[in-house]
């Protein structure tokens, strides 16, 4: 029976696991019936990913599914032969996972979430809620260097003053928010990162504690009390990763499977959080929302 290795930063999440399994099932694969899995999860500790990737490779899996930039790179460094399906935030060509989007080459393919290209839109959204010329804080994982450089370039091109606070692991989050508060930022842009998604409840709680409006990439943040998100569907990306995994199980080569990019994006606003922050969401913004959480 084929084995799928699962490598991720966070803990198990039933919603995300179910999305991946739906993608597999679309192509006729069901865990426990005709395919099995070996999961390795770093539980928020980036330093564990390299060793966990090596562990998975030593089990001779049929393929590896890696969620997040650092996990994908760890898997790629651990093997050049085992097929890899990734879900990442960055340009896979820039970070060395693929030769190009149409024909990746090598042993890795998957889904790129177009994070940096959405930053300008998210900046525009948050600027509708804060005073002109306000400083915006950026919470980012320093391991995502390409993403940081792209966001800083976007900020410069728009004249946006940016205070960068770095957080690599969960213990870094409180000091990062303390830095942003000290810098008197008016709002926070939370960068896309698998660790941030895994720690979303803590990040949302910190933003609330410090009365900071924050915008995020995915609806999973406003679902737990974050103010606003704009971006693609995580569940949709994982479901697509499931279909790619199934194609590889059927004999497709990663080098021939084009890297997918999302084409649909959703604006989600948590109106309860807005009221608690004393923010009046403009009617024009509410009308553009795909979902308003009461």
PLM segments and residue spans:
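Short hydrophobic alpha-helices and adjacent helix-cap/hinge residues
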Residues: 1-294
């Amino acid at each position: 029976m084929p084995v799928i290795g699962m490598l991720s930063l966070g803990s198990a999440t039933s919603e995300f696991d179910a999305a991946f399994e739906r993608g597999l099932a679309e192509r006729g694969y069901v865990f426990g019936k005709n395919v099995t899995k070996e999961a390795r999860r770093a539980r928020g500790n980036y330093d564990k990913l390299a060793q966990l990737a090596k562990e998975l490779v030593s089990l001779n899996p049929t393929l590896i599914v890696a969620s997040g930039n650092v996990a994908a790179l760890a898997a790629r460094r651990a093997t050049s032969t085992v097929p890899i399906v990734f879900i990442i935030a960055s340009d896979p060509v820039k970070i060395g996972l693929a030769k190009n989007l149409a024909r990746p080459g090598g042993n890795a393919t998957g889904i790129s979430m177009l994070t940096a290209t959405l930053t300008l839109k998210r900046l525009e959204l948050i600027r509708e809620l804060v005073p002109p010329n306000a400083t915006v804080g950026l919470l980012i994982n320093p391991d995502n260097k390409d993403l940081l450089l792209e966001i800083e370039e976007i900020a410069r091109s728009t004249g946006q003053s940016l205070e960068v606070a770095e957080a690599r692991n969960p213990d870094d989050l409180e000091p990062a928010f303390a830095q942003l508060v000290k810098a008197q930022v008016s709002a926070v842009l939370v960068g896309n990162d698998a660790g941030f998604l895994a720690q979303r409840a803590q990040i949302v709680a910190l933003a609330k504690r410090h009365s900071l409006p924050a915008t995020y990439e995915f609806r999973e943040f406003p679902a737990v009390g974050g103010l606003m998100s704009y971006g693609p569907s995580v569940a949709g990306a994982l479901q697509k990763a499931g279909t790619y995994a199934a194609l590889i199980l059927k004999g497709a080569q990663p080098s021939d499977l084009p890297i997918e990019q999302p084409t649909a994006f959703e604006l989600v606003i948590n109106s309860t959080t807005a009221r608690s922050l004393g923010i009046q969401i403009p009617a024009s913004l509410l009308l553009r929302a795909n979902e308003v959480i009461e």
